[in-house]
């Protein structure tokens, strides 16, 4: 038991070290950018583009089931993290004022999040979406973009001081499990068979990319003007 506890403490210490190595690399420009990137509503245009791809490639009934599947994936991921796991693990966020390291943590706009952060809902939700789309389309560049998008979301949470890397890894696993389960349920219910040729998959990449460019410009304006 002692050896197990020592190993666990070693992982916690490593997690904290990695957290600080990321959180300490900050400046005003990226404070604005990461804060904007970590937002939820700013990604609505990209979500609309994903819906557009479904509408252009699937029957409306399949599209409806896809949207329900995505909603269930995100609901599962969010509830698994916030309701089922966090109250039992009770790992405080690094930014929480009751955490001894909180005074050394760089935060943005005085945002500290809730009390507990393991697992990360942001990681679970974004990777749940990313993995569901991977299972659904299996398109290389869309997969690369959406996985990079989810990964940068995770990075932003450490940068903003509200999550340890371990929180994000656990959230990613929750998102993967949720996406895998709901996708296979979706296939069983809808009889979905992946089409050989899927069109308009660049739409989410374009809209998501333009959104990121907009954030970069916004951060520049707030920093230098």
Model-found features: residue ranges?
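N-terminal transmembrane-helix/juxtamembrane module of multi-pass inner/ER membrane proteins
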Residues: 1-46, 81-111
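Membrane-embedded catalytic cores of phosphoryl/pyrophosphoryl-handling enzymes
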Residues: 106-225
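Interfacial segments of alpha-helical transmembrane regions
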Residues: 51-80, 142-144
